[in-house]
Amino acid sequence: MKNLLVRSIYKIKSTQWFRDRADEGDIYQHYMQMHKISLDSFKQHLQGDWEFVFFNKEVDDIQQVFQDHFFELYDLWKQGNNILYCGPDNLMIKPTKFFGEYNDFRMFNYTDPKSFNGIEHFLNADVRYYSADMNPDTWTEPLKQAENWDFSEWNTEQIILNKMLWNQEGRTPQNTIIPKMAYQAHGVWLTNDINQHIQRANAWNGCAIQDSHIIHLHGSRNAPNKLELMKVLHREFNENT
């Protein structure tokens, strides 16, 4: 059994995501720069013995990334590994344990919107943990759904993964949601009003940014600005400690 930190960055030909992102410049390079900062922060703080697995290729459409990576992660899990998936726009700012802490599939905090598509507690999928010991039946329905991927819906991946999470026996919001493990900074940008942004984000998350373990910057909401924000937060929380 290995402990794996996994992420992917694909070069995507189409600029159409949930909107046309052509105005953001070279998105691939922005994400690669975020990835380097992010990985440095995980090397600094992620506890335990672990290896890094990186998937990198070229595809036509963003939804291909999500579908491909669903099966890539499943293949790694079938080999008997514990897997922590964290996208490149995540910054770890405190010593943090994942490996061996959970025995099932986990996500940790809400996304925006907090309810969606009939899922009352709709969690963000950019920080997620697959225990090697999780029940294999957890995968049965999600694999069928992933084979019939809805390429027209931006949230297809999160819909599948939320159903996978909440269909597990004993999962409740009370024993699942831990905001500090995946602080959502979707509403924080590097502007003159950043302190106000953070205050609103703290209220939304239910915890203060400085008390979090991972900050998810949401690079899809303006990659150039989120990259600069990541640099600032990395200096503040990691390089000055």
Language-model segments: residues:
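N-terminal anchoring/stem segment of glycosyltransferases
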Residues: 1-79, 222, 234-241
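Short catalytic/ligand-binding loop motif for oxyanion handling, primarily in non-cytosolic enzymes
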Residues: 13-16, 61-62, 92-95, 100, ...
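A structural signal for well-ordered alpha-helical scaffolds and beta->alpha junctions
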Residues: 32-39, 66, 121, 135, ...
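Short amphipathic alpha-helical segments and helix-helix/interface helices
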Residues: 36-43, 73-74, 96-99, 161-162, ...
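Structured N-terminal alpha/beta-domain signature
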Residues: 51-53, 83, 128, 160
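Conserved beta-strand termini and adjacent loop/short-helix elements that scaffold enzyme active sites
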Residues: 53-57, 108, 180
